[in-house]
């Protein structure tokens, strides 16, 4: 029994780290100013540096002589004194732009990885499953500050980060980075869209409601690798669940009547809303261009075949001794979307910035890549 226990023993490694980092404001200077523009700006020399505290706990465990491995990491970061910019009304001067330390944001989550490697007959198999969750929350918004010109107190209930027709993304205390608010249509007590009998159309409401967050609730990944007699097969499936996205592309095309949705509506004699048919032109001229953001808000859940490769090791060493191995492979990335409700790829990015995520505004479509590789080992 003791020998069996020793053979099947497991190894567990735990670690914990804590760090604090600072990020100073931009050092790029032009004309003795850190920013230049057409409107007057105040110098931002009094800004405090951005400050981040992070704590991470990890666990690594191996079972069955490391044929099965488990890795778990949990983390939390707190970033304070984030710099933001905004306009303040100044009597007799108009609006003046200035920078200020805006808020504190906490970020927490975990990642779980389960991997296995074993032989099934003559086939060697390596598999890896990952599951991760990440959440952020605005814990504190702008502390009461003084107007640098008038010396009066001012405070902000929210910081508007981006805005478009029928939508905007704010920072609010208790909210998260990536929150999207949209305009809606008038509804009855049961939540059904109200139809105006006179105009034979829906009724827009110029108030914003919370649509969701651009970030997923959780992500999953599955990677498998099989090898047999010089052949290799590898594939990766990636999935993100939850989150929302808004398509300005679809909204603009609907406005001009050049989308597939408007063509179908014309062929069907109108658009069915709450059991009533509305003329297609009336409906899309009113809600198009995302004037009603809820119409163009989509679930961002998607599952895709992210990567796949087939390879073969040519045994050239049998004939050419100075070449150890030749590996020929066919590789494809972003090959197949297995599930996606949105009319765009939710994983594609509109920019490298933070505040435009989840908004499809004529962003470039994602690409499917295919190629081959030849590797020689001497």
Please identify what each model-predicted range represents:
Residues 12, 57, 226, 240-242, ...:
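Compositionally biased, intrinsically disordered low-complexity segments enriched
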Residues 7-10, 14-163, 297-378:
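Extracellular/periplasmic, surface-exposed regions of secreted and cell-surface proteins
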Residues 121, 233, 241-242:
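Short secondary-structure capping/turn micro-motifs that flank functional sites
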Residues 7-10, 14-26, 135-194, 248-276:
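A surface-exposed, glycine/aromatic-enriched loop/edge motif typical of exported proteins
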Residues 26-69, 156-236, 277-318:
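Outer-membrane beta-barrel transmembrane strand signature
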Residues 74, 235-239:
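Glycine-rich, histidine-containing beta strand-loop boundary motifs that form or position
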Residues 240-327, 331-333:
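Extracytoplasmic gating/loop element in the C-terminal half of outer-membrane beta-barrel translocons
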Residues 1-2, 6:
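Short, exposed "boundary/linker" segments that immediately precede the start
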């Amino acid at each position: 029994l003791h020998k069996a226990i020793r053979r099947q023993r497991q190894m567990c490694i735990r670690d914990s780290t804590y760090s604090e980092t600072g990020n100073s404001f931009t050092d790029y200077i032009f004309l003795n100013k850190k920013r230049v523009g057409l409107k007057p700006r105040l110098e931002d020399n009094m800004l405090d540096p951005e400050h981040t505290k992070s704590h991470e706990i990890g666990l690594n465990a191996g079972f069955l002589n490391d044929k099965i491995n488990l890795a778990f990491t949990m983390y939390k970061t707190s970033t304070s004194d984030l710099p933001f910019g905004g306009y303040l009304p100044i009597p007799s001067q108009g609006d003046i732009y200035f920078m200020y330390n805006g808020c504190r944001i906490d970020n927490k989550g975990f990642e779980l990885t389960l991997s296995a490697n074993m032989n099934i007959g003559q086939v060697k198999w390596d598999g890896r499953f990952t599951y991760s969750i990440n959440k952020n929350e605005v814990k504190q918004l702008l502390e009461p500050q003084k107007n640098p010109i008038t010396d009066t107190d001012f405070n902000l209930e929210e910081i508007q980060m981006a805005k478009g027709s029928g939508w905007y993304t704010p920072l609010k205390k208790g909210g998260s980075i990536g929150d999207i608010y949209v305009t809606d249509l008038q509804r009855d007590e049961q939540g059904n869209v109200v139809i105006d009998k006179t105009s034979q159309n829906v009724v827009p409401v110029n108030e914003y409601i919370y649509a969701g967050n651009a970030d997923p609730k959780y992500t999953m990944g599955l990677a498998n690798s099989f090898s047999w007699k010089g052949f290799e097969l590898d594939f990766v499936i990636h999935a993100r669940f939850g989150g929302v996205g808004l398509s300005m592309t679809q909204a603009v095309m609907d406005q001009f009547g050049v989308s597939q949705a408007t063509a179908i509506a014309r062929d069907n004699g109108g658009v069915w809303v709450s059991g009533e048919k509305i003329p297609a032109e009336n409906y899309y001229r009113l809600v198009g261009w995302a004037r009603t953001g809820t119409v163009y808000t989509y679930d961002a859940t998607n599952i895709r075949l992210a990567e796949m490769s087939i390879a073969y090791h040519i045994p050239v060493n049998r004939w050419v001794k100075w070449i150890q191995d030749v590996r020929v492979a066919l590789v494809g990335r972003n090959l197949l979307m297995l599930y996606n409700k949105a009319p765009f790829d939710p994983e594609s990015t509109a920019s490298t910035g933070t505040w435009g995520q989840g908004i499809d505004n004529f962003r470039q479509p994602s690409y499917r890549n295919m190629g081959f590789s030849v590797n020689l080992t001497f």
